[in-house]
């Protein structure tokens, strides 16, 4: 079994924010980079590159995020404290249930909105980047929500490790069908690790029942966007929604994985070739979109 490691940048963020909290958002943005994030060059580079690839100016994004830092500071602090309390036990559960044999670095930081959880590599090792600003925004600072989030991201890392793909895997997720498969796989792993269906990303108690009732419609809408080469980001991520419901793509992907589990092991599902993922994913969506649910 590998080991969990922690890189906690919260003390550095707190020192930066003590100096920057009363300044203009433009100054806060500059100081975030120079006083805080430049101490972690790879972490900085990953965030900036994410927005560059989408043709966005990270400073403009930061201007929308930084004004909430003061009001969300207590939730960010609680999230950081809870992560420290639980990350080792969640890693142990994941190692036992998924038979993991690699180290994971958990990076706790305050960034520019690149996600509450981000499964990737850091210093050439498997890593989970935990963005406190997004965690606080989603109100995922409780231990229950964080256990789900961390388990979900470990699921992504297990998937990458079994496929022996890291950067290539993140690039493959740009295809909407592969993203559906990837997020569904991670969501299934979350439930396996925690021993029950936790759905940490459900925004309220009605979310799951709505998704089940609208499963056919969700599949049809996802297919329509693929066919018209439209973005599917409304199905994923905390800033987007479908008919007012966020994160519905995770449910749709989870159902895809559950269907595949009827004839395959989890590892066999993890190792499906990209072309086969797309073929099976489209078959699943087409079949589902022609069904009606009460």
Residue ranges and their predicted role:
Residues 130-133, 158:
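Hydrophobic, aromatic-lined core segments that form the binding pocket/scaffold
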Residues 211, 217-294:
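Pan-zinc metallopeptidase signature
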Residues 81-85, 180, 247, 251:
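Soluble non-cytosolic domains of exported or imported proteins
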Residues 134-150, 177:
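Short pre-active-site segment immediately N-terminal to the catalytic Zn-binding motif
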Residues 68-127, 139-143:
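Auxiliary, metal-adjacent structural segments of Zn-dependent hydrolase domains
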């Amino acid at each position: 079994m590998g080991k969990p490691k922690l890189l906690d940048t919260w003390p550095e963020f707190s020192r930066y924010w003590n100096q920057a909290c009363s300044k203009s958002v433009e100054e806060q943005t500059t100081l975030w980079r120079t006083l805080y994030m430049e101490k972690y060059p790879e972490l900085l580079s990953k965030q900036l590159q994410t927005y560059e690839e989408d043709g966005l100016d990270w400073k403009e994004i930061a201007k929308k995020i930084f004004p909430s830092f003061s009001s969300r500071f207590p939730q960010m602090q609680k999230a950081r404290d809870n992560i420290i309390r639980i990350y080792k036990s969640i890693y142990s559960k994941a190692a036992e249930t998924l038979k993991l044999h690699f180290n994971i670095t958990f990076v706790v930081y305050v960034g520019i909105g690149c996600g509450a959880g981000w499964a990737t590599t850091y210093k050439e090792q498997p890593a989970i980047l935990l963005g406190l600003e997004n965690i606080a925004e989603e109100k995922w600072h409780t231990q229950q929500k964080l256990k789900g989030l961390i388990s979900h991201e470990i699921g992504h890392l297990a998937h990458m490790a079994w496929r022996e793909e890291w950067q290539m895997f993140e690039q493959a997720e740009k295809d909407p069908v592969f993203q559906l498969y990837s997020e569904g796989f991670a969501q299934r792993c979350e439930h396996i690790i925690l021993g029950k269906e936790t759905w940490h990303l459900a925004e309220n108690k009605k979310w799951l029942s709505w998704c089940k009732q609208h499963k056919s419609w969700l599949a049809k809408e996802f297919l329509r966007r693929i066919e018209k080469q439209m973005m599917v980001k409304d199905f994923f991520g905390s800033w987007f929604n479908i008919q007012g419901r966020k994160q519905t793509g995770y449910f749709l992907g989870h159902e895809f994985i559950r269907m595949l589990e009827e004839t395959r092991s989890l590892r066999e599902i993890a190792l499906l070739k990209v072309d086969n993922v797309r073929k099976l994913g489209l078959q699943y969506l087409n079949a589902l979109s022609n069904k009606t649910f009460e």
